[in-house]
Amino acid sequence: MLDKFNPQLIEDQLYLESEPFFKAALKSSATPYAIMMPPPNVTGSLHLGHALTYTLQDILIRFKRATGFDALWQPGTDHAGIATQLVVERQLNEQNQTRHDLGRDAFLEKVWQWKEYSGNAIVAQQRRLRISADWDRSRFTMDEGLSKAVVEVFVKLYKENLIYRDKRLVNWDPKLLTAVSDIEVVIKDEKKPFWHIRYPLADNPNQHVIIATTRPETMFGDTAVAVHPEDERYQEFIGKYILQPITGRKIPIIADEYCDMEKGTGAVKITPAHDFNDYEIGNRHNLERLNILDDHAHLNEAVPQQYQGLYYLKARKMVVADLEEQGFIDKIEEMIGASHYGERSGIEVQPYLTDQWYVNAKALAKPAIDAVKSGDICFVPKHWENTYFEWLNNIQPWCISRQIWWGHQIPTWFGPDGEIFVEKTEEEAYAVARTQLGSDVVLRRETDVLDTWFSSALWPFTTLGWPDQTAELKRYYPTDTLVTGFDIIFFWVARMIMMGMHFMKAVPFKTVYIHALVRDEKGQKMSKSKGNVIDPLILMDKYGSDVLRFTLAALAAPGRDIKLGESRVEGYRNFCTKIWNAARFLEMNECQFDAEFFPSTNAHPIDQWMTAHILELKRTTINHLNEYRFDLAAQGLYQSFWYIFCDQYLEALKTLLLSDHATTTKKVAMWALFEYLSLLHPIMPSITSHLAKYFKMHECLTNYKLCTKNTQLEQTQTDILWRLIDEVRSLKGLLNISGGLMLQACLVTPEGEFDAYKDVLKSMARFSSLGAWNSDCPPDGFYLPCVVGGFTLFVCFDEALDKASAKNILQQKQEALEKEILHLDKKLQNQAYKNAKPEQWQEDYELLELKKSESQKLSNFFKFF
């Protein structure tokens, strides 16, 4: 073996050798288990959120394979409509071209070329994590099969009256000239002016209602002013009219409970065509929707001529100046308010009234709600169900059209008078048009494409071959587990459930595991502007994929964000080193693996104890992974390997290898190492596979099946051994004595009992001699006792220090402990502290109990002075 573990030297070759075992076995008799990988954008680059979700999914897939399931992990990529189009458009801009210069077909050809040569970089980065997806089954949301399925779904939903065309408000990006989804909008809190504007009453222009707004240019789209029906200030005005400043247009004063009497002046300008809340109020009161912007966010012909054609920000300045000049400004305040920016364009998006295609999401939501309420789908952690229900119970029509070119072009054709024909093909559309209109007409194809989330919502069944009834679809649908982040519960998870329930009449998955957000070590969200982004590719270059994977798994506590700094990763790099060094130690001591060997009651008691511990560790690890407690599984394996196997068992091994049990002990040690490797493999596939192959344990751990056994093995006295050793070390520490100093000791025990452990105790506790003693009183000299489970070990300190010095040391430590106890006791009696910080209070309480126990232990020593 190499002196040090070098992941760069082994990972690539091991991964290639393992790939044949990543495939699902369609004709297997094993129980199927399936995970659909959330498809990353083809424009994407691997970030820590990706690394976390892929690591957790891979742990599940490898674990299920190892426990006998036929595991399918379906990979693929998303065409990422707007993002991909922008990448190619930027390339064209560098050549002083636009997509319009090329035309739609030529531009799309360019995009496909880009996708072919550059669009799969994210897949190569995924593979750097050594994840075991069934790569040969990889799908793309715009490949031929999925495109066919998307058309099928759109046409069916339209003919079921669940898709329709409507003029509604959308998030409009004036730079990209398309509607965008809420998730593509970045909300920033910014300081902005809050203009208080006087709106004169129509029947008494000397009286006015003051309206506060941050967007005075939209006043030309006002079609009402609203007040709360219980606001006493405005009772006399409800039902009257006011005059819009500058234009003098009459608009009504209405009552609506949406108005907040405590905010601003309590009176709100209602602009249904340019504000989402106003749009709903307008619907309730049947108000006109007056659009005053064009698609570039310039004011249109619906406003006074002097403002027409002005960009909205320039128009805002001009409107404010005119309002001030005409005496309509009451005052100007500064406030902190939310501004909405396009994630990709960087400019402010506008609520904009435009014709779009919509899904009647409310009709699809009820079965999706029922699926979770009934327990057919479970969220882990469970509290995320509340978020899911909140969104679906308040669901709005889903805008599925985008005004771009890259994507699934909507299968709709328009007739000469606006007739709509939704069919799977152009030929079918013309045939239906000919039948309905009675003559041949020229149809115009809809230019809009579908929202990327539309095709993604079909991912669990279209990737398995739907609408064809394939063997894969029958075997692997419904899938089992979805692993994803909380931010797309609505945008993706809920929509997959809606579509699965509608088209498959069954849930798309049984469990939704929502993982945490990866933050920096201070708990702050990572962002380029803060300069605190950690690149997983750089971490893997430096430490290897196993270290990053194990770090993420160990920190993946449910419901708690991950605080990640490079120091954490370095710490788990040491764990890899520990595994490597343990394996080298066994090799140096000529331990060899025997595939037919299983430890028995004939083995040394310490070997039996190690065996029993591993069998219990295997059971708990399997339980943790079945319950999605990746953190407990990883931490349990870490603690066990480092402290039980290395610090205890391998240290004892140095003595056992000199005993009559040496041959069996070597086999037990290698059996134990293999069991650790097989349990660690789902989390750390590279180092475990390498060592298993090197020691001829198993050709490929990816194909190894975990199994559990029940056996009665000795454990009790071995536990006492470790506790005695710990007590000796602790006592040396109390007296400020070097742990390596050799001392004399004697053990009070019946003759013959504990003999199997004495050599190990002598070696690991650093005794120059270990005799037998048959009295509860120590021999002559300066002895202090270590008492564990009915066994008393007297340790002689004559060679280390005199009694007076030892007593003085212990008294000083006792006094310091008493001060800590008094301080903690006083702190815990503060009821306000307990109420304000219950978790911290509990930690302090447990610390107090520990300190009291330490104090009692010290007190017991004084009787020996």
Residue ranges of predicted features:
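N-terminal, positively charged nucleic-acid-binding surface of large information/translation enzymes
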Residues: 1-230, 254, 271-284, 288-306, ...
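Gly/Pro-rich turn-and-neighbor structural signature
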Residues: 16-18, 145-176, 184-186, 198-202, ...
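Acidic, turn-prone loop/beta-hairpin segments
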Residues: 78, 174, 180-186, 414, ...
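Core structural elements
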Residues: 117-121, 126, 574-587, 607-616, ...
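Conserved phosphate-binding loops in nucleotide/dinucleotide-binding enzymes
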Residues: 188, 270-273, 313, 350, ...
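Alpha-helical recognition segments enriched in aromatics with Gly/Pro capping
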Residues: 201, 257-259, 285-297, 404-407, ...
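Catalytic adenosine-cofactor/nucleotide-binding cores of aminoacyl-tRNA synthetases and other
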Residues: 341-345, 386, 518-522, 526-603, ...
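C-terminal low-complexity, glycine/proline- and small-hydrophobic-enriched intrinsically disordered tails
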Residues: 570, 693-865
